[in-house]
From Swiss-Prot:
Residues that hold ATP according to the record: 169-176
Chief subcellular location: membrane
Site (Required for activity): residue numbering on this chain: 362
Record keywords: ATP synthesis, ATP-binding, Cell inner membrane, Cell membrane, CF(1), Hydrogen ion transport, Ion transport, Membrane, Nucleotide-binding, Translocase, Transport
Catalysed reaction, written as an equation: ATP + H2O + 4 H(+)(in) = ADP + phosphate + 5 H(+)(out)
Gene name for this UniProt entry: atpA
Organism: Anaeromyxobacter dehalogenans (strain 2CP-C)
GO terms, molecular function: ADP binding; ATP binding; proton-transporting ATP synthase activity, rotational mechanism
PROSITE patterns per UniProt: ATPASE_ALPHA_BETA
Family statement: Belongs to the ATPase alpha/beta chains family.
Protein name: ATP synthase subunit alpha
Subunit structure: F-type ATPases have 2 components, CF(1) - the catalytic core - and CF(0) - the membrane proton channel. CF(1) has five subunits: alpha(3), beta(3), gamma(1), delta(1), epsilon(1). CF(0) has three main subunits: a(1), b(2) and c(9-12). The alpha and beta chains form an alternating ring which encloses part of the gamma chain. CF(1) is attached to CF(0) by a central stalk formed by the gamma and epsilon chains, while a peripheral stalk is formed by the delta and b chains.
Database matches in PANTHER family: ATP SYNTHASE SUBUNIT ALPHA, MITOCHONDRIAL
EC top class, as a word: translocase
Length: 510
């Protein structure tokens, strides 16, 4: 065998050329104990709070506790194979998630990894999960409406862009339905929607995605799911992942909406982590910083000033109450952080009043300044009328002979309750809401309400047929309201004439 010196020297030269002087330094510790997805690690003296760690099998972990002789970390993934004594590496990274237009129409997990079987996201940008909320100077007061398509909300508890409006109520009272209707109503409004499902059944999330697809809403929506079977750290992180993705649109001068469904499950996941990390428990066994958990999340919803691009992020957090108890720890915390709340009541729901909004307790602290003038004109007295009706209805149970004025008020109240009823996944444009509420609250030439002669059980049919009639015979009225956003004398005159005409052709059944 011939040894060729030039060949050998060429190979040696190539190897020298490829030789790198770079030395990789990795700080590695070992697991002292691991239970229920929380590990205690010895030997990571340089670890920072919120840093990502690498466990065996490529599983990531998040540093939550820094103690004198060890580090407490939450394992974000399956932890059954992780044993005592296993090595754990520091990554030096803070948790980041993909952001951008590429996420629209996708379903991702609590860390932004796609779970819809449609391949990688190919997102061009990444953002840190934990960033500070915009300061006072960067903000502007809420002044633009964010329509939900639900008469009871847009008329009585209006929501503005950049607002945080809490939706709370017992289980199965229609909280998610209100949120989904809001997404459906904003089709074509250049509003990017993010739905964060925390601790939900996977079948429930699949149903929500299916509904959004059916109505063509998935093209401007991203679903972030940390389901009931996911580890507690994923359920704790999912809302922050969602808000980080939504902030990308807010900071680029666009408008976004985020729905957290629901934050009580995030608080439960955080309580679980805190107790396993042996942090001292407080009221209802929640840790002392559970308020900060939600406040730092909800403060990231904001209406930015013109100098910052005038973008907005509206938040609709959902909280589940137990037996209507609004004074429990988590509900009171979130009520104090948000700009108002919509309270859904199981009693109303079972009576067939849907959406089951308790108008008395529900408020919107800043939405009034975002409501369009036309809605203010027609719905000004609606809340008071409904409150009077509820009060009288409670007294009327005890009295048999009621005077005529009381009977009139009760009959009118019953019709107003019917007027505010609405089917699921059937949001109405604001001009159509204004027309229906005008018919319910304004008076005809004789000084009576337009729907005074309509039997209570036929009000819903009257309202549906009224819109069909106006679409067919007087389409200009709705267009004029949409353009002017106010009811001037000309529109009122046309609307009164149309209502008079409709009264002549509407047939009362039975």
């Amino acid at each position: 065998m011939e040894i060729r010196a030039d060949e050998i020297s060429r190979i040696i030269r190539e190897q020298i050329k490829d030789y790198g002087k770079k030395v990789e330094v990795a700080e590695t510790g070992s697991i002292l104990s691991q239970a229920d997805g929380v590990a205690r690690i010895y030997g990571l003296a340089g670890a920072a709070a919120g840093e990502l760690l690498e466990f065996p099998g490529g599983i990531r972990g998040l540093v939550l506790n820094l103690e004198e002789d060890n580090v407490g970390a939450a394992i974000m993934g399956p932890y059954e194979h992780i044993r005592e004594g296993d090595p754990v590496k520091r990554t030096g990274l803070i948790a980041e998630v993909p952001v951008g237009e590429e996420l629209l129409g996708r379903v991702v997990d609590g860390l932004g990894n796609p779970i819809d079987g449609r391949g990688p996201l190919n997102a061009k940008h990444q953002r840190k999960i934990e960033i500070k909320a915009p300061g006072i100077v960067k903000r502007k007061s809420v002044h633009e409406p964010m329509q939900t398509g639900l008469k009871a909300i847009d008329a009585l508890v209006p929501i503005g862009r950049g607002q945080r409006e809490l939706i709370l109520g017992d289980r199965q009272t229609g909280k998610t339905a209100v949120a989904i209707d809001t997404i459906l109503n904003n089709k074509g409004n250049n509003l990017y929607c993010f739905y964060v499902a925390i601790g939900q059944k996977q079948s429930t999330v699949a149903r929500v995605v299916d509904t959004l697809k059916k109505h063509g809403a998935m093209e401007y929506t991203t679903v972030i799911s940390a389901s009931a079977s996911d580890p507690a750290p994923m359920q704790y992180l999912a809302p922050y992942t969602g808000v980080t993705m939504a902030e990308y649109f807010r900071d680029s001068g666009r408008h976004a909406l985020i729905i957290y469904d629901d934050l009580s499950k995030q608080a439960v996941a955080y309580r679980q982590l805190s107790l396993l990390l042996r942090r001292p428990p407080g009221r209802e066994a929640y840790p002392g910083d559970v308020f900060y958990l939600h406040s730092r999340l909800l403060e990231r919803a904001a209406k930015l000033s013109d100098k910052e691009g005038a973008g907005s992020l509206t938040a609709l957090p959902i909280i589940e109450t137990q037996a209507g108890d609004v004074s429990a720890y988590i509900p009171t915390n979130v009520i104090s952080i948000t700009d108002g709340q919509i309270f859904l009541e199981s009693n109303l729901f079972f009576q067939g009043v849907r959406p089951a909004i308790n108008v008395g307790i529900s408020v919107s602290r800043v939405g009034g300044s975002a409501q369009i003038k036309a809605m203010k004109q027609v719905a000004g007295s609606l809340k008071l009328d409904l409150a009077q009706y509820r009060e009288l209805a409670a007294f009327a149970q005890f009295g048999s002979d009621l005077d005529k004025a009381t009977q009139e008020t009760l009959a009118r109240g019953e019709r107003l309750v019917e007027l505010l009823k609405q089917g699921q996944y059937a949001p109405l444009s604001v001009e159509k809401q204004v027309i229906q509420i005008y018919a319910g609250t304004q008076k005809d030439a004789g000084g009576h309400n337009w729907i005074r002669s309509v039997p209570t059980e036929q009000v819903v049919r009257y309202m549906a047929e009224l819109l069909e009639f106006l679409d067919a015979r007087h389409p200009g009225i709705a267009k004029a309201i949409a353009e002017k956003k106010a009811l001037d004398d000309g529109i009122r005159k046309d609307l009164d004439a149309a209502l008079t005409e409709f009264a002549g052709i509407f047939k009362i059944e039975g």
